[in-house]
Structure formats: C-alpha cells, structure tokens
C-alpha cells in the first residue's frame, strides 16, 4: 500500500541481479525474497510461498519481548545497566480484572500521585493513540479505573482467566484487562515552545549468525498543536504529539540539532544508540519456519527532557508511515525500502551494481 509497483521494480532492477517473480512460473515455485508492509502482513494468499528471506518475523512466539508496552521496559531493566535505566520511565502494570474482584486494592497506587506526580495511563494492546489518558491526581485515576471496569465487567463474568493468559494479543485487546501506568515526562524539551517527540525507525534482522540491528541516523519530529504548559493534561492540543499537528515538516537534524548545539546533539545520539543496542539484546523473535532469514521494520517514540536525556515511550511493531501530504525524505516509503534492501537484502543477494550510501540520512548498523 505504501509502495508503488513501478518504484519497487526500479529499485530492484538497478541492482542487476533481480527479476520479478511470476506466480505461474512452473520452474520456480517460490520467490527468493518477499517484502510486505503492514497492510499485507496477514495476506493469506502469500502464505503458500517459502522464500528464504521475508520481511516478517514470528512476534507471537517471542513472549512479547518488544511490542508489549510493559514487557519491553521490564526486559530492558533485566540487563542491569544504570545508563540504560536512566532512559526508561517508571511504570506499573494495572490489572482491571483483579481490581474488579477487589477494588480496595486501588489504594495501593494512591502514594504514586503524591507531590503532584503526573502519570500516563494506557491500555497495553492499544495502538494509534487510543485508550490513553494523562492523570494528575489519584481521584482522577480512580474515576477512570471505575469507569473502565463498569464498561467492561460484563465481558469478564464468564472469563476463564487461565485461558485468557494464553490467547493472542488481538483477542486480549477485546477484554481491556492489562494496562500500564507510566511516568509522565513533565519537563520536556520544547521546540518553538511546543512539546514534541522523536519518531525513529529500527530494523531488526534475524540471521543464522545472530541478530543484527540498524537504526536510522535521523528522526521525524512530531509536535503538539499548541504551546506547552504544565497543566490542563486532558487537553490533547497541548499534550498529544502527532505528525499532523506540526505546522511544518520538522526533523531532528537539522531543525532540533541546530537549536541545541553539537554537544547536546551528540549526547542524545549516544543515548539513542545505547537504547537500541540494548533492545537488540533482548529480542528473541525468530523467523517463521518457512523462512531461513527474516527482518522487521519497527518505529520508536522517544521524548527528550529539558536536560537532554532521552526517555523511551514505546516501540511500534506496525508503524504507519505518514501520508503523502505529511511525509518527507526520512519517512518516505521509497527511501525506507531502498535502505532495507541496501542493508539487509543486498547482504544475502550480492548486487551486480551496488548502491552508494546516502549522503545525509541512512540506517547505521548497531
């Protein structure tokens, strides 16, 4: 959906070693390489093909090491790295099913809101900014929890909770049981007086020699619509950051880096590299049995504090790329696909005409 057939063909044919696979070819039943974006990741018509290299990994067999909002941070903490821990937000897992059985347990979280501490509360299996709320008092937290229980408790009446633990993430999403209360960054670095976050891209490559990772050396900047203030937390125009909220297309380099200077830019990039090197260590995601090699395209959401420390918000396993009106060079689907082919596909199938590394924006190996 993001890529056009003619653009894919041009990118591959330039290398001099690729031909388009023909499904009716009787002498070659399987392609050597399959790439699908998020819109075709569940296309059953492709399941019959056994390509040595494919752009899908078996996330369901990985015990949620990366795309689960709560487990990702907990797994990173297990690396026992103080520098890494400084990049992670405090968090608590909230089980609505348990609270419904004993609502008095909600008092266990009251102390978290002392000294006007602000938290963001989000459903673990949500995406696209849904089921997320910022809370600045225990009373508001309690009110939201009670509302959520009231709306969903009928689903839980006949639920076999032991079976629930073993069902897939999509089905779990129907029950709204597992939530995470995550520390809210209330001292963000601002751009033109607006809150923003970094949207980055990360490639995970599974080979027979171990895991490899690549991170884009630049980031899109998603801003809030209105200028930042430390209150009115339910006002999404102030506190929600999205690509369509920005009045112009903004990147970390040069837009932010020119404002904060070379020293702070380097400091931030070093933290980003440490974060993704660590993420690469905890991923155990295998290929599907029919593929010898595989890779996956992830997006990351990172916020920078006023003292130039990064904080990981989450990793997105199915990142939607901006539409044509909002895209730019580093989020352009053709650019990303070319970099996937250069960094991963060309390693398996050596091109006759190797491409050059882009001058400014490119993926670097971790």
Where are these regions (language model features)?
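Catalytic-loop signature of eukaryotic-like protein kinases
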Residues: 301
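Catalytic core of tubulin tyrosine ligase-like
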Residues: 115-116, 124-296, 304-311, 316, ...
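A short acidic/small-residue loop/turn micro-motif
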Residues: 318-320
């Amino acid at each position: 959906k993001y890529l056009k057939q003619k653009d894919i063909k041009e990118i591959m044919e330039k290398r001099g070693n690729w031909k388009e696979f023909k499904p009716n070819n009787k002498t070659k039943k399987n392609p050597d390489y399959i790439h699908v974006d998020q819109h075709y990741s569940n296309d059953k018509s492709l399941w019959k093909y056994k390509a040595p290299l494919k752009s899908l990994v078996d996330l369901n067999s990985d015990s949620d090491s990366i795309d689960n909002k709560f487990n990702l941070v907990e797994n990173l903490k297990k690396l026992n790295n103080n520098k890494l821990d400084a990049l992670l937000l405090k968090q608590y897992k909230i089980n609505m099913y348990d609270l419904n059985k004993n609502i008095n347990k909600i008092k266990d979280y009251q102390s978290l809101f002392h000294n006007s501490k602000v938290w963001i509360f989000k459903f673990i299996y949500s995406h696209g900014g849904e089921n997320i709320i910022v809370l600045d008092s225990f009373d508001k937290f309690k009110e939201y929890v009670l509302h959520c229980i009231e709306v969903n408790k009928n689903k839980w009446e006949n639920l076999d909770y032991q079976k629930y633990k073993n069902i897939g993430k999509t089905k779990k999403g129907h029950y709204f049981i597992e939530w995470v209360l995550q520390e809210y960054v209330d001292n963000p670095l601002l751009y033109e007086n607006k809150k923003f976050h970094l949207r980055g891209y990360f490639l995970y490559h599974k080979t027979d020699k171990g895991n490899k990772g690549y991170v884009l050396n630049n980031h899109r900047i998603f801003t809030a619509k209105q200028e930042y203030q430390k209150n009115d937390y339910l006002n999404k125009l102030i506190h929600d950051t999205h690509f369509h909220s920005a009045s112009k297309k903004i990147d970390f380099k040069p837009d932010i880096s020119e404002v904060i200077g070379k020293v702070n830019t380097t400091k931030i990039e070093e933290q980003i590299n440490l974060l993704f090197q660590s993420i690469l260590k905890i991923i155990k995601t295998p290929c599907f049995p029919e593929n010898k090699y595989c890779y996956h395209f992830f997006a990351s959401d990172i916020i920078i504090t006023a003292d130039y420390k990064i904080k990981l918000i989450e990793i997105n396993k199915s990142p939607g790329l901006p539409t044509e009106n909002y895209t730019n060079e580093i989020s352009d689907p053709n650019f990303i696909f070319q970099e996937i082919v250069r960094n991963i596909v060309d390693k398996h199938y050596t091109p006759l005409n190797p491409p050059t590394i882009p001058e400014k924006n490119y993926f670097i190996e971790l």
